Amino acid sequence: MAAQTLDDLPTPALILDRAILRRNLKRMSDRLRDAGVALRPHLKTAKSVEIGRMAVEGHDGRITVSTLAEARYFADGGFSDILYGVGIVPSKLPAVAELRRRGVNLRCVTDNVAVARAIAGAARAGDTFSVFIEIDSGAGRAGLPWPDLPGLLDIARILHEAPGVELAGVMTHAGHSYHESTPDGLAAVAEQERRAIVGAAERLRQAGIPCPIVSAGSTPTAVHSRNFAGINEMRPGVYVFNDLDQEFIGSCAPTDLALSVLASVIGHYPHRNQMLIDAGALALSKDISAQEFKPQVGFGTIVDAPVRDMAVVACSQEHGFVGAGEPIPYGNLPVGSRVRILPNHACITAAAYDRYYVVDSELDGGRSVVGTYDRINGW
């Protein structure tokens, strides 16, 4: 690739600071290694083989994905222990089986008796499966709700007794951690998550059913947990990049945000103290998660803004409306100049792009493009 700077790139473009990425990866890697907990990073955020390889460096290589397209992509990239972390349906079992026949230990997830029976039936036809039972530790999304765990033993027995099926363990995701913003509050959610998933594992073991893997994880609970006892695997994801939401809930510092969107200024509107950029809803997403804690961030904040509270305050499909808490100095930001926007939710913002343009703030302040990483999108 010919030498490029940020000024040479088409806009909008997805910019990744490699130096910050590496620091984020090392911080989580060291934390879980010191705790004696296996790291299975959730690569739905990065969706990149290059970043995935960096994330598992020094660990055993296990990963989590959220689509079958990701599973195929990472399998082609050499990953062999992959958890497909979205509840499986019978129509997708042939795709799982196909990857497993290639030697990939693609594991699936269920919280449903009928699906467990379908998995057992597919195994009787000659395929093999590795399955986690999903537990709801308080997020209210998927999983058997703790503490009642209705159907846990029925599902577990179907899977455990089926030839060709491995009951890999139990897993949970404390998604409600994203609504806390104090260390004590986040630690409390992490402990709730731990008690639920360890309790589910103990219930299986008391019934004589093995439960090898006890898997939990979100970035906030991985960062703020004060007790990993009984958990032997964590699945954080957004920690690789971080974002405004993670900053505001206290999972990272402002200097830990590795991802931004590069956009061009396309119009000045001083009568309303706004300017337009060519990054709108499709380039940034309309995720407003960070507004729960700091409403003025809008749909993303401007990096190195010349005035206070400069942010994307509204979006249409391809237009971003930039406002500020003070008069915008338009002379500093002429039409055609570039700005970078920090996203509210890195996972959703990154999903619009097919590649990362990689910079390194430790080399030249992050002005030069030092490479690209590809991404997998779709399902």
Regions found by a protein language model. Name each.
Residues 270-379:
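C-terminal accessory subdomain/extension
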Residues 42-179:
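Active-site-proximal beta-alpha core segment in soluble small-molecule metabolic enzymes
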Residues 21, 44, 74, 133, ...:
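Conserved, mostly hydrophobic/aromatic
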Residues 20-51, 62-64:
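N-terminal glycine-rich anion-binding loops that anchor highly charged ligand groups
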